Regions:
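Transmembrane alpha-helical segments of multi-pass membrane proteins
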Residues: 63-88, 144-161
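Membrane-proximal helix-loop-helix units in multi-pass membrane proteins
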Residues: 78-144
Length: 217
């Protein structure tokens, strides 16, 4: 994230103000193409690996192994929380200030290339990996699908399809960039769905409390 913010700061002003300039293609459209390929590849490899190496006897693991997996799962949850912050908060708010300062001449502005097509996929990939890890390796998540988990992962994921509606609206209505515009309500609604992770934490606390009553052998 630090490198991305540095890149945006350096090349956003020098090469990102005119989408018809050759330097925009060099520094920003190529950035977009590369990140999309890397994201699809990373998601396929990471999710595929977690699923391929799933534990087929997850209900038979020892309490000690289950505790270890819960700590690994917590690591995934923390990573997801960090990714959600940078995607749905930091870079999203930054995008608002960009549009209040610069007149857009393309949907693929430097701030959009980083916000919509980099920071959002990062938290989607991380959230999906966290969900798959819990589903394939922890007994607490074996009975059906956790509604709390689905809300906390699918909700923020739906921000990405909402981007299409948002860009269409801005193009069709030539709207002023206002945070309170009805067109932005979807970002707020789906963004707050991330609070479903509190329900996941509740499941974790319950599972850990049961484990602590056992001999960890």
């Amino acid at each position: 994230y630090a490198w991305v913010r540095w890149y945006e700061g350096v090349y956003g002003w020098s090469a990102g103000l005119d989408s018809f300039a050759p330097e925009f293609e060099t520094y920003w459209m190529n950035f977009l193409y590369i990140e999309l390929v890397l994201e699809v590849t990373t998601a396929a490899i990471l999710w595929g690996y977690i699923w391929k190496t799933r534990d087929r006897n997850v209900m038979s693991i020892t309490p000690r192994e289950e505790l270890r997996r819960h700590f690994t799962h917590w690591t995934w949850l923390v990573m997801y929380g960090i990714a959600i912050y940078f995607g749905a908060s930091y870079f999203t708010e930054q995008d608002g200030t960009w549009h209040q300062t610069i007149v857009r001449d393309t949907d693929f502005t430097p701030s959009h290339i980083i916000e919509f097509y980099l920071s959002y996929p990062i938290y989607i990939i991380t959230g999906g990996a966290s969900f798959l890890y819990a589903k394939t390796r922890l007994p607490a998540y074996q009975d059906g699908l956790s509604l709390q988990y689905l809300v906390s992962v699918v909700g923020p994921f739906m921000i990405l399809p909402n981007v299409g509606l948002n860009e269409w609206g801005h193009t069709f209505w030539f709207m002023e960039e206002l945070f309170v515009a009805p067109l932005h309500y979807g970002f707020v609604f789906f963004g707050w769905a991330a609070l479903g992770v509190l329900g996941v934490i509740n499941i974790e606390v319950e599972a850990l409390s049961k484990l602590l009553k056992k001999d960890l052998v």
